[in-house]
């Protein structure tokens, strides 16, 4: 038995020394299986493996039926975050002492099957009937099991649960908007003093001096301050969220709601499910919150029902359909994120995602139950609206605002806002995606044909539609011509004729294009202008005609108008891309292998300047809060990036004793990265990380600045570490970022290798993570085209890109890495930085100055570091 399997199962070579050979017991096993139903978690592996071994021993192939509990769990436990047997056991409260050991796995699989059957029997019969019809796509005999349970339920039907209703064949949770009723008449008094807060908190919350300062600062800003903007730096883990929610609860009403923006969907959920319920235990006027997300996060019931009428016949699609049928009996929000899926790019979600209320018709079966309409009603009865930064920033791009004006906007985790604002405002045009979309609309019985069929006697409208289709075809050809000209220009400048991954365009390069390419650009702009005129004319014509149309016809018209809006944006993008050469706009493209695969991008380095956004003037007061806002003595780095340099900054003293709670280590033998070969550097990382992982039996997060280096170190280490019982999870291997984080959080001693986004927003409880390794100081690669372009822009603004941008950004990332470790006054954490530039380079002193004061930075040999880390973390476990 290999070491890897020994660690996985706990079964050693010693234990099996006297065990019989499979050949000796094969006949017994075969006889035991006769007339049984084979149940397994991922039956395809177990059944086929066992069958192969039995046949090897000369026995006939198994013919017994089989049931797969993985597929059953995916269908009947749709909101579980993971379907691995160990994770399900933990989530459902099963005792699973020996994961991957046959007897323990079998017992837990049996418990899981019984629980799933119990859940199935609680479903409405109509739901199970629909699942049964789709279940032919499940493996082995799982479908027979579903039909068996259904038949038994039909023999003794139970009345429909009172919380459910049947609408047009779908069983749904009943929903009611909770009306906001003010418990108090007149003013409530905010508890400013320590004594008043202690009385209010009782035994539910502990009074904290720093949190009290934060609460009063928040209340004062929204009631007294003259300045519109205020920044507050408050350490993570000091009760920051409760610290701003409580004072706002004394001010916010549904007419003047508090809008709270945080960095991610996960943190939105955390505020909703953890922080507000805790605070509501203390308040005599409870907060009534609602999470607001873009429409596409919600399911459109009418569209989902449509997928059941004509199922596409693909297995994963059917599994999603069945899971959603179960989920609809549970959800009151229709928020697809409740399904914890990491692949929302599947065709199923494109088919069922909501597109907005403009696509609904009043006489549709599900109009009254529509989740987005329900959300809009809830917003009117809520005094706290919880959004994320991307949603907030997108307000600038919306025709109609989705957020109300208010006196109160609070932006949490504000240090993420500049990057998110720039990313959201990065305009792009994928020629391939657009052409496929137009081809689909041109297919028989698709949108254009359907619209045409609605106009049998409307000759003018038919003529406009015919011309419009011709113009779209000409536009697609013009796009290809322009793309070909740009690609020829770029390849002519490359020594090998190859295309780089990203190409930054300048006006000078555009002027070098040959005459025919210049003509193609003129044609492209002309087609866009003509399409604009046609769309305006068609809107006027259709507004008159559509009054006599049916609801389905109007929904198709809404789809056509959606295409119009898309082309309006496309025109603005390409017009800017070809004509607008202001310094802060970066024109670039991704070539692809052919002209049709080209993607145009327009990036705006001033997108994070808040005063120029649509939403900034709609709020009387804005408060910006985060754990790391100032960088050493530089108090205006972030406010400058946001265009609000005059905003005052208040710093709430950190409650943590970094001298006792944290250590930063820099190995004396760490190589100077630029002075050794790439292979020598990778070997050094492998040696350093192996020593640490072998010694410390706890979760470790390793942060890289290069995907290439990450992959090479992972490939060198992961098998040898697995044999020693340590699993390395790595970005780019084994699933999405969300899936990797989920597995890392659920495991007790995994190692996670991450780059890019793993530096940001890895939200783990302090006690779940005590060691972070930084393989190299987190500077952006200066050779990357976008970094070069940003540096050139900063220089044009009179800013030193290295000292005023790169160094502060690197310092901010290191502070955030340290902030992941220390979240309570009892946490201990270690930051191991395998880059000596922190202590040898001139700018290293600036970075150190930006880190918390008194955090010890130790330069030691690697072996001494291992020993010191072990002793430091062990002290914490011993309670000293």
Explain the meaning of each model-derived region:
Residues 224-246:
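Walker A/P-loop
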Residues 1-65, 78-100:
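Conserved non-catalytic scaffold segment of RNase H-like nuclease domains
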Residues 269, 274, 357-384, 388-530, ...:
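Signature of the SF2 helicase/ATPase Hel1-core->accessory helical subdomain module
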Residues 194, 255-256, 262-382, 787:
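A substrate-engagement module of RecA-like helicase motors
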Residues 667-679, 732-837:
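Conserved RecA-like P-loop NTPase helicase motor core
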Residues 356-380, 393, 398-400, 534-670, ...:
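A contiguous, basic/glycine-rich beta-loop/short-helix subdomain that forms a polymer-engagement track
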């Amino acid at each position: 038995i290999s070491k890897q399997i020994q660690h996985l199962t706990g079964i050693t070579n010693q234990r099996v020394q006297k065990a019989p050979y499979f050949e000796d017991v094969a006949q017994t096993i075969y006889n035991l299986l006769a007339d049984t139903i084979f149940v397994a978690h991922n039956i395809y592996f177990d059944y086929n493996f066992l069958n192969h071994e039995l046949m090897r021993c000369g026995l006939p192939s198994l013919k017994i039926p089989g049931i797969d509990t993985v597929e059953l769990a995916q269908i009947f436990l749709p909101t579980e975050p993971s379907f691995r047997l160990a994770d399900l056991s933990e989530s459902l409260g099963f005792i699973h002492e020996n994961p991957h050991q046959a007897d323990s796995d079998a017992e837990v699989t049996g418990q899981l099957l019984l629980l799933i059957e119990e859940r199935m029997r609680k479903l409405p019969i109509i739901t199970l009937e629909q699942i049964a019809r789709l279940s032919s796509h499940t493996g082995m005999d799982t479908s027979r099991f579903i039909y068996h349970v259904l038949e038994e339920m039909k023999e003794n039907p139970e009345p429909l649960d009172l919380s459910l209703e049947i609408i047009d064949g779908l069983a749904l949770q009943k929903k009611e908007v909770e009306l906001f009723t003010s418990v108090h008449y007149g003013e409530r008094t905010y508890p400013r003093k320590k004594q008043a807060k202690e009385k209010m908190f009782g035994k539910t919350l502990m009074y904290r001096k720093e949190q009290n300062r934060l609460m009063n600062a928040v209340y004062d800003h929204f009631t007294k301050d003259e300045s519109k903007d205020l920044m507050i730096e408050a350490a993570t883990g000091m009760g920051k969220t409760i610290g701003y929610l409580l004072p706002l609860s004394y001010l916010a009403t549904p007419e003047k709601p508090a809008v709270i923006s945080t960095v991610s969907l996960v943190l939105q959920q955390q505020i909703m499910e953890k922080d507000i319920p805790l605070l509501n235990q203390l308040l005599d006027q409870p907060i009534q919150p609602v999470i607001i997300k873009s429409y596409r996060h919600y399911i459109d019931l009418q569209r989902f029902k449509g997928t059941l009428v004509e199922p596409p016949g693909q297995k994963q699609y059917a599994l999603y359909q069945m899971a959603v049928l179960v989920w609809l009996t549970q959800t009151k929000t229709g928020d697809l994120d409740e399904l914890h899926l990491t692949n929302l790019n599947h065709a199923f979600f494109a088919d069922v995602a909501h597109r907005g209320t403009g696509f609904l018709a009043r006489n549709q079966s599900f109009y009254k139950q529509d989740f987005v309409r329900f959300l809009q009603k809830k917003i009117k009865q809520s005094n706290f609206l919880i959004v994320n930064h991307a949603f907030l920033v997108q307000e600038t791009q919306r025709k109609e605002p989705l957020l109300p004006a208010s006196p109160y906007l609070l932006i949490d985790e504000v240090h993420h806002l500049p990057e998110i604002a720039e990313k959201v405002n990065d305009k792009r045009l994928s020629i391939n995606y657009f052409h496929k979309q137009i081809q689909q609309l041109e297919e028989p019985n698709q949108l254009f044909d359907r619209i045409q069929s609605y106009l049998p006697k409307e000759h003018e409208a038919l003529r406009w539609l015919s011309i419009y289709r011709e113009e779209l075809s000409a536009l697609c050809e013009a796009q290809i011509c322009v793309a070909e000209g740009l690609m020829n220009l770029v390849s002519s400048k490359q020594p090998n004729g190859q295309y780089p991954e990203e190409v930054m365009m300048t006006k000078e390069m555009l002027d070098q294009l040959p005459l025919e390419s210049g003509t193609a650009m003129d044609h492209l702009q002309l087609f866009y202008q003509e399409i604009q005129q046609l769309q305006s004319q068609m809107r006027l014509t259709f507004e008159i005609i559509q009054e006599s149309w049916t609801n389905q016809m109007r929904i198709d018209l809404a789809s056509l108008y959606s295409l119009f809006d898309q082309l309006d944006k496309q025109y603005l993008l390409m017009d800017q891309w070809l004509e607008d050469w202001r310094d802060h706009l970066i024109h670039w493209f991704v070539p692809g292998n052919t002209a049709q695969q080209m993607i145009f991008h327009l990036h705006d380095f001033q997108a994070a300047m808040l005063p120029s956004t649509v939403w900034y003037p709609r709020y009387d007061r804005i408060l910006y809060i985060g754990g790391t806002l100032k960088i050493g003595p530089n108090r205006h780095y972030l406010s400058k990036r946001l265009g609000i340099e005059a905003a005052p900054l208040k710093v709430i003293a950190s409650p943590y004793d970094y001298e006792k709670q944290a250590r930063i280590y820099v190995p004396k033998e760490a190589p100077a990265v630029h002075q050794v070969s790439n292979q020598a550097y990778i070997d050094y990382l492998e040696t350093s990380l192996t020593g640490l992982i072998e010694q410390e039996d706890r979760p470790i997060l390793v942060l890289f600045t290069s995907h290439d280096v990450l992959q090479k170190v992972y490939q060198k280490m992961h098998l040898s570490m697995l044999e020693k019982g340590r699993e390395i999870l790595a970005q780019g291997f084994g699933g999405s970022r969300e899936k990797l984080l989920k597995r890392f959080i659920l495991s007790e001693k995994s190692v996670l290798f991450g780059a890019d986004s793993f530096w940001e927003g890895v939200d783990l409880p302090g006690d779940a993570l005590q060691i972070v390794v930084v393989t190299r100081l987190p500077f952006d690669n200066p050779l990357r085209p976008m970094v070069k372009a940003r540096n050139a822009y900063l220089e044009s603004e009179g800013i030193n890109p290295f000292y005023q941008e790169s160094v502060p950004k690197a310092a901010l990332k290191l502070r955030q890495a340290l902030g992941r470790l220390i979240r309570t006054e009892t946490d201990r954490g270690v930051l191991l930085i395998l880059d000596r530039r922190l202590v040898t380079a001139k700018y290293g002193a600036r970075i150190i100055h930006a880190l918390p004061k008194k955090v010890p930075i130790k330069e030691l040999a690697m072996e001494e570091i291992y020993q010191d880390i072990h002793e430091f973390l062990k002290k914490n476990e011993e309670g000293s």
